[in-house]
Amino acid sequence: MPAYRSRTTTHGRNMAGARALWRATGMKDGDFGKPIIAIANSFTQFVPGHVHLKDMGSLVASAIEEVGGIAKEFNTIAVDDGIAMGHGGMLYSLPSRELIADSVEYMVNAHCADAIVCISNCDKITPGMLMASMRLNIPVVFVSGGPMEAGKINGPGVTRKLDLIDSMVAAANPDVSDSESEQIERSACPTCGSCSGMFTANSMNCLTEALGLSLPGNGSLLATHNDRRELFLSAGRRIVELARRWYEQDDASVLPRSIATRAAFENAMTLDIAMGGSTNTVLHLLAAAREGEVDFHMHDIDRLSRRVPNLCKVAPAKNDVHMEDVHRAGGIPAILGELDRAGLIHKDVPTVYAPTLGDALKKWDILNGDEEAAHLFKAAPGNVRTVHAFSQSSRYHELDQDREGGVLRDKAHAFSQDGGLAVLYGNLAEDGAIVKTAGVEASILTFTGTARVFESQDDAVAAILGNRIVAGDVVVIRYEGPKGGPGMQEMLYPTSYLKSKGLGKVCALITDGRFSGGSSGLSIGHMSPEAAEGGLIGLVEDGDRIEIDIPNRTLHLAVSDSDIADRRERMNARGASAWKPNRERVVSKALQAYAAMTTSAAHGAVRDLSQIIVKTRI
C-alpha cells in the first residue's frame, strides 16, 4: 500500500519543524492525517482567460475540505498569447510551458502533496500542467476556466458573431473604416474566458476530457455560466476520492499514467482531428506523452489523420460557430459519441469520473437522452459584458441534435471524410509538418507556388502589408523554430494579414514556427527539421517552386538534388554563421538557455535531457 506522500512532512518527531510551519498555515491537530491536495491555480490579471480564476482556488478548496481533505493553493505564471503576439513577447510563450511544468513539479514535490487539482485555461498553461501531471503521476483532476462568450455585432437585419481574429483582420483591411474597426474591436471579446473559437486554449481543454483527466463540460461550458461552479466543486470532491483510492486502496487505475495511456492519447488526437483543433495541440500532446513515457509519436498522428473525418467546424474554420455552439451540440461527449459510433475511439479506457469512457458516454452523450446531460449542455451565453465567473444562468430552449446539417455531424454527413489536421512529409519536412486542413479551402488543397523567403515574421508582415505578396506566392518564414526563434513564435499576424489583403485563398504560408489556433488558410507549420538545425527550409531561395499536396500528404521543394547539395555545401562553408538568420534580434539569456536545450517540433519541442548527465545516487 503506498503511503501518503504528505506524511513525510506531517508525521514523526523529526518533522516537528515542518508541522510547526503547517500549523502556521492554519492546519490543526486533526488535519495531519488527511490527504494534502495541491491546487495549482493560474490566476492573473493579464489574461482574460484567467482574470476570473482568483476565487476558483478557494471554491475548489471548500469542496476538498468538505469531504475530508486539506487544500493548499499555489499559482503559476500564465502568458496571454494574443497580447504577446506580433512582437518580441511571443518568443516567451512556448518556453513558458516548460516553466509552468517545472513550477508545478517543484511545488508539489517540495511540499510532498498527495494529489493535484489543476486550474488552467489558456494556451500554454493547460499543456504545462499536463506535462507536470504526467511527470509526477499522482492523482490529478483538471478544471479549466472555460471559454469566452462569442462577440456579437448587430448588422442590417442580422447579428454577426465575432472573435479576436475578426478584430485583427478588420484592423488590417483598408476597406474597413476606423469606426467599424473600433466597433469590432470593442465587441470581439465580451467576457472573461479563453477566446471563443476552437483555438489552442479551448482545443487543449477539450482534449483533457478525451484523455480522461477532466469532467464533462470542461472544454465547452462557458466561463460566465453559473453551472461551471459545480464543475469546480465536483473537481474538489473527486480529487479526494481519487487520492483515497490510490493511497488507501492501492488502486493504481486512478493515476495519470494509468488513465492517459497510449489509447487515451489516440482518443485525444482523434478528437482533435475530428473537431479541427489547433495545430499547437500536436506539439503539446507529443510533449505530454514524452513526459509520461507514452509511446505516441508524429507517425501515430499521421496514421490517425488519414482515417478520422472532420465532424465539426468551429471558428476560425467556420466564422459563425463558436464554443458556445459546440456546447449546445453536446460538447466533447457528443463528438466522442459520434466517433464511437464510427468505431474510431477506444472506449475501454478509464477516466477520473467514470470506470471507462464508454460508461461516461452512455450518460453524457446527449443522444442517449440523459436529463442531467441535457441540462448541462443547454447552458447558454448571457450576452452581457463581464469579467466575472458564474454571472449568468441563461439556457437554450433546445439542444442541437442535428447530426446531418448541425454544428456537429455524424460520419456519414461529415464536413469531409479527411480529418481537420494533417501531417505532411517531403524533402521540406523530412520529420513532418502540420496543417489545419479544416481551415483550408478545397480549391487549394493542392497548390504550387513561388517562394518568397523571409528570416523573420516582422519582415514577412511588412511585405504583406506593403502589397509585395501576390496571388500564387508561398510565403516562407524561417529561423522561427524552437531553436531558431528561439521559442517558435506563432504566425497569427501574417495569416490574418493575408486574409485582410484578400490573399487567404490564393497564397500559402510555410514556416518552422507555429500558428495560433486562430489561424486558417493554407498555413503549414512545425516544419522539421527547422532551419537552425539544418532543415531544407534554410536553403529555400526566392523564386523556387514549392509543391503542396495535402490529399497525398506531401510538401516538396522542386529543386534538383544536385542544386540542393550545392546550396548545403555553401551554407556549411559559412562556419560560425551557418544555419543562422540574417536579422537583428536581441535574445535574452533565459531564451538562449531554452534554445540550447529544446528539441524539434516533431518531438514536441521538449527539452533534450540527453545533454544532462544525471547522478541517480550520490
Swiss-Prot record:
It is an enzyme of class 4 (lyase). [2Fe-2S] cluster binds at C122, C195. PROSITE patterns: ILVD_EDD_1 (PS00886), ILVD_EDD_2 (PS00887). Its EC number is 4.2.1.9. Keywords: 2Fe-2S, Amino-acid biosynthesis, Branched-chain amino acid biosynthesis, Iron, Iron-sulfur, Lyase, Magnesium, Metal-binding. GO terms for molecular function: 2 iron, 2 sulfur cluster binding; dihydroxy-acid dehydratase activity; magnesium ion binding. Mg(2+) binds at D81, D123, K124, E490. GO terms for biological process: isoleucine biosynthetic process; L-valine biosynthetic process. Binds 1 [2Fe-2S] cluster per subunit. This cluster acts as a Lewis acid cofactor. The keyword RNA-binding does not apply. InterPro entries: Dihydro-acid_dehy_C (IPR042096), DihydroxyA_deHydtase (IPR004404), DiOHA_6PGluconate_deHydtase_CS (IPR020558), ILV_EDD_C (IPR056740), ILV_EDD_N (IPR000581), IlvD/EDD_N (IPR037237). Its cofactor is [2Fe-2S] cluster; Mg(2+). Pathway: Amino-acid biosynthesis; L-isoleucine biosynthesis; L-isoleucine from 2-oxobutanoate: step 3/4; Amino-acid biosynthesis; L-valine biosynthesis; L-valine from pyruvate: step 3/4. Belongs to the IlvD/Edd family. PANTHER family: D-XYLONATE DEHYDRATASE, D-XYLONATE DEHYDRATASE YAGF-RELATED. Functions in the biosynthesis of branched-chain amino acids. Catalyzes the dehydration of (2R,3R)-2,3-dihydroxy-3-methylpentanoate (2,3-dihydroxy-3-methylvalerate) into 2-oxo-3-methylpentanoate (2-oxo-3-methylvalerate) and of (2R)-2,3-dihydroxy-3-methylbutanoate (2,3-dihydroxyisovalerate) into 2-oxo-3-methylbutanoate (2-oxoisovalerate), the penultimate precursor to L-isoleucine and L-valine, respectively. Homodimer. This is Dihydroxy-acid dehydratase. It comes from Gluconobacter oxydans (strain 621H).
